[in-house]
Amino acid sequence: MQLNSTEISELIKQRIAQFNVVSEAHNEGTIVSVSDGVIRIHGLAECMQGEMISLPGNRYAIALNLERDSVGAVVMGPYADLAEGMKVKCTGRILEVPVGRGLLGRVVNTLGAPIDGKGPLENDGFSAVEAIAPGVIERQSVDQPVQTGYKSVDAMIPIGRGQRELIIGDRQTGKTALAIDAIINQRDSGIKCVYVAIGQKASTISNVVRKLEEHGALANTIVVVATASESAALQYLAPYAGCAMGEYFRDRGEDALIIYDDLSKQAVAYRQISLLLRRPPGREAFPGDVFYLHSRLLERAARVNAEYVEAFTKGEVKGKTGSLTALPIIETQAGDVSAFVPTNVISITDGQIFLETNLFNAGIRPAVNPGISVSRVGGAAQTKIMKKLSGGIRTALAQYRELAAFSQFASDLDDATRKQLDHGQKVTELLKQKQYAPMSVAQQSLVLFAAERGYLADVELAKIGSFEAALLAYVDRDHAPLMQEINQSGGYNDEIEGKLKGILDSFKATQSW
């Protein structure tokens, strides 16, 4: 087919009219060095702090060092095939993770990708991993409890919704067990949970997920995983990603609980990144901003007022407060709580639960040391009945510890001292609790009432455990309505006191333990 000159000129005019002159501008740079997951890039003049940088192979790095001639970034994922001379691009975006109810019951990695083989996520949107914590005016005081199901914690170291309570102790003292039981106890409370596993073995995390599923708590929980085999960048970012997922519920007038297991490993990962970025080291080779690393994370755990929730949801949710309660875990070395990271986190949080190796090895589990454990704001959140009955327990244990130390040097003790020692031993025995067996408020209240009112005086020390088990079985069988009433109201008055006394009198008469 031959075209004449008129057709050719018409075709050229048509092409010129349709020609699109839109150009795409992007900030491009070149990798100049790669070492242990840290890359140095030349040419990204307009890069932002914390910006995602697009790498070859659909991977990303995060810009952490902005220098005069180069940018230092950490690679999120494998980096073995990255080499000098490769081209990279700025994205203009800060790292975001998927959030929403569709994540409940799922196991995801730091970037929010599912790793449990249950198919794609049904997320409600994305949220930036780094967010500014709510201000003072947007907060509300902590006055509602988070029940862990442990007698020793709920009675003596109560935790409130929106509080940050540190769990601290050496390895193998039951820190994770305490946190997992706290999650299991929330399965019927309406509190959504987020468990962030940092630098742990994949087999350990798999075991935790299985236990949560067995006890019906996984459906209410998001598990965020950065295993020991993953890069330091992913371990460093995992707590922030988990926090963003928890904030989704807080900002919509719901209650959430987040466990960081553990922040010691996050600090070590951040130290590794900082040293590779050639930042000046400080005490214990940690960088100067390691305090800020944890403070900006833990300050995001808060109870926010109804005005904040209403403004955030644009009027969809009214009259509801939201909360994010944090239980960070710190591992100490040989009980040294005065090390750099432990002292930092102690000063940031609203209290701490100390778990001791000596108590754990002596069979006192949970191995909580009530003498140096404290909850600075949780007392206001305690239910009325627990507040009334727990005061005597703390006093009894304090007196027992003092007398036990004194009695080692004294041969003959008077009757009053012997009674106090005996009572302290029985209370210590009573506070022991098996793993994966959290107790309701009513069950704890009944047991504490028995201890405080002297019902254990004629029970042998070896039979305290069987006495408690038989008592709880007895009330579940014959007095379930009263237990339900206490669980719902948490109140305490003369009528409830009389009923508890009647239950214990009738139970003691059966001698069934």
Curated annotation (Swiss-Prot):
Gene Ontology CC annotations of this record: plasma membrane; proton-transporting ATP synthase complex
Binding site for ATP: G169, D170, R171, Q172, T173, G174, K175, T176
Protein name: ATP synthase subunit alpha
Signal sequence segment: none
Site (described: Required for activity): S373
Name of the top EC class for this enzyme: translocase
Record keyword Transferase present: no
Membrane disposition: Peripheral membrane protein
Function, as annotated: Produces ATP from ADP in the presence of a proton gradient across the membrane. The alpha chain is a regulatory subunit.
Record has Nucleotide-binding as a keyword: yes
Compartment(s): Cell inner membrane
InterPro entries reported for this sequence: ATP_synth_asu-like_sf (IPR023366), ATP_synth_asu_C (IPR000793), ATP_synth_asu_C_sf (IPR038376), ATP_synth_F1_a_nt-bd_dom (IPR033732), ATP_synth_F1_asu (IPR005294), ATPase_a/bsu_AS (IPR020003), ATPase_F1/V1/A1_a/bsu_N (IPR004100), ATPase_F1/V1/A1_a/bsu_N_sf (IPR036121)
Recorded family membership: Belongs to the ATPase alpha/beta chains family.
EC number: 7.1.2.2
Keywords per UniProt: ATP synthesis, ATP-binding, Cell inner membrane, Cell membrane, CF(1), Hydrogen ion transport, Ion transport, Membrane, Nucleotide-binding, Translocase, Transport
GO molecular function list: ADP binding; ATP binding; proton-transporting ATP synthase activity, rotational mechanism
Oligomer and partners: F-type ATPases have 2 components, CF(1) - the catalytic core - and CF(0) - the membrane proton channel. CF(1) has five subunits: alpha(3), beta(3), gamma(1), delta(1), epsilon(1). CF(0) has three main subunits: a(1), b(2) and c(9-12). The alpha and beta chains form an alternating ring which encloses part of the gamma chain. CF(1) is attached to CF(0) by a central stalk formed by the gamma and epsilon chains, while a peripheral stalk is formed by the delta and b chains.
Reactions that this protein is recorded to catalyse: ATP + H2O + 4 H(+)(in) = ADP + phosphate + 5 H(+)(out)
Cited HAMAP family: ATP_synth_alpha_bact
